[in-house]
């Protein structure tokens, strides 16, 4: 597999073409952003942790019957994935009130929902990723009804897998963001990453935040939190 030119750079990753038109290489960066890009910084070692954690969790999704773009981990920071066209819908699955949900609806953080809830946002930096519903997505031709139904099905299935896994690690899955893509034959697959960048993860006993909120809220201990959540994952899988 030959690595070719860079074809994309986002806030947290670079993407490179390969000599196979169906495959690309994702390179995870240590760069961090928050507050709609207004807050920028670096989290030492984040790229390594997010790459390796994502790959392990994507493997668990595949074993649970959820198709993903994951192919093979190449190095500490690089992974070979299927080339996809990203569906411009960010999916947010919430189990507990936190973050924008809490501030938007004027509720305290930490309220456990009777059942998980799902939100969509339009993946568009210029518009600051506005929330939208399924009818908006259809009107804007962002996806079809069939694709939206499948994305919802996969998102709730991901939630089931992640909640059970993190519970065994002594971690509560508060909420998380997902992205999906379409392969060249139109198959919907889970893409992007599953990491402390995209998930809210609290220690089950102390409710200590072990995710990017430590960066967003200037809480300190960001690198330690990322390292701790990775350690719990590795310790779990080693047993």
What is the meaning of each model-derived region?
Residues 2-121, 233, 237:
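Active-site loop/lid in soluble adenylation, ligation, and acyl-transfer enzymes
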Residues 38-48, 131-154:
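Short histidine-centered catalytic/ligand-binding loop motif
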Residues 72-77, 166-182:
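A short glycine-rich, hydrophobically flanked beta-strand micro-motif that places a catalytic Asp/Glu
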Residues 93, 173-192:
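Conserved metal-phosphate-binding beta-hairpin within the catalytic cores
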Residues 111, 116-128, 159-170, 195-200:
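Phosphate-binding core of ATP-grasp and ATP-grasp-like enzymes
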């Amino acid at each position: 597999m030959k690595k070719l030119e860079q074809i994309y750079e986002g806030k947290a990753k670079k993407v490179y073409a390969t000599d196979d038109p169906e495959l690309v290489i994702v390179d995870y960066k240590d760069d961090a952003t928050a507050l709609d890009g207004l807050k920028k910084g670096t989290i030492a070692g984040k790229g390594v942790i997010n790459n390796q954690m994502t790959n392990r969790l994507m493997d668990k999704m595949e074993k649970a019957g959820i198709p993903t773009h994951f192919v093979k981990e190449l190095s500490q920071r690089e992974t070979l994935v299927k080339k996809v066209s990203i569906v411009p819908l960010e999916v947010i699955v919430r189990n507990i009130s936190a973050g924008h949900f809490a501030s938007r609806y004027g509720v305290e953080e930490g309220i456990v929902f009777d059942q998980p809830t799902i939100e969509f946002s339009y993946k568009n930096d210029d518009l600051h990723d506005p929330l939208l519903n399924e009818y908006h997505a259809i009107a804007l031709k962002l996806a079809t009804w069939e694709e939206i139904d499948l994305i919802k099905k996969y998102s709730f299935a991901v939630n089931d897998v992640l909640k059970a896994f993190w519970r065994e690690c002594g971690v509560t899955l508060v909420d998380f963001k997902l992205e999906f893509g379409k392969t060249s034959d139109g198959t919907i697959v889970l893409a992007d990453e599953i990491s402390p960048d995209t998930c809210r993860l609290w220690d089950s006993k102390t409710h200590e935040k072990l995710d990017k909120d430590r960066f967003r809220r200037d809480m300190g201990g960001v690198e330690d939190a990322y390292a701790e959540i990775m350690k719990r994952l590795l310790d779990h899988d080693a047993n």
